[in-house]
Amino acid sequence: LLQDRTGYIWCGTSDGLNRFDSRHFKTFRHIPGDTASLGNNVIHSLFEDSKGNLWIGTENGVFRYRVSEEKFSTFHLPDIPDRLSQKIIYSIKEDQLGKIWISVYGSGVFRYNPSDGKIKHYSHDINDEKSLISNLTTKILIDHTGDIWIATHDQGVCKYDPFTDSFFRIDATDKQRGYTARYIYALCEDSFGNIWLCDNGLFKYDKTTRNCTACLPPADEPITYIHFITEIQPGILLIGSNSGLTQYNLAEN
């Protein structure tokens, strides 16, 4: 879900993109032969950039919707082998410099600079410990300080170092319990600057102490496969998972 600057609510589904104007829905779907239509009907991510363009991440690539023209266009990503019939886009974000970061599951991360049109591809290199930790990238988080966090489906999370144009791994292990966040499906930052990592459980990463704590739900209220997390007010997290919708009060733990 996304609410844009004009008030429209956009809803990505497995059967197209819906726009709600508070009274009516309008549905956008792929139309064979129409290059100005949405290129794929399975939506995984939505993002509005600082210029008001809507970015749509789908099961097979990225598309942009120009509101003024009411047209979709394909955003071409380089370096992705043609044999990859599916280019799943789980996350699209804009950093403080106006550059667009795109997570492509299986291919790593792409950074697009609108000012010159250049695209840089970041991928895992087994011989380079400062490369992206995995190509199975899922979510991207840009926190209030501008730090860029990249979550992966098998190697946990890493941060981008803009000074060296490289990445370093975050130790997301609760050392007391021995649990490690490795299969990250969702990320968010709370009002206190903590980073929340979600896989089959919930982990809090303290940026100041660099400690990671596993926050376990009650045994009778299990939370499995968390796909979404956000802070709806200071100290209150809303978590979407296969178990339903859960509200987590940080003060009461």
Where are these regions (language model features)?
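Carboxylate-rich, polar loop motifs that coordinate divalent cations or form catalytic acidic clusters
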Residues: 1-253
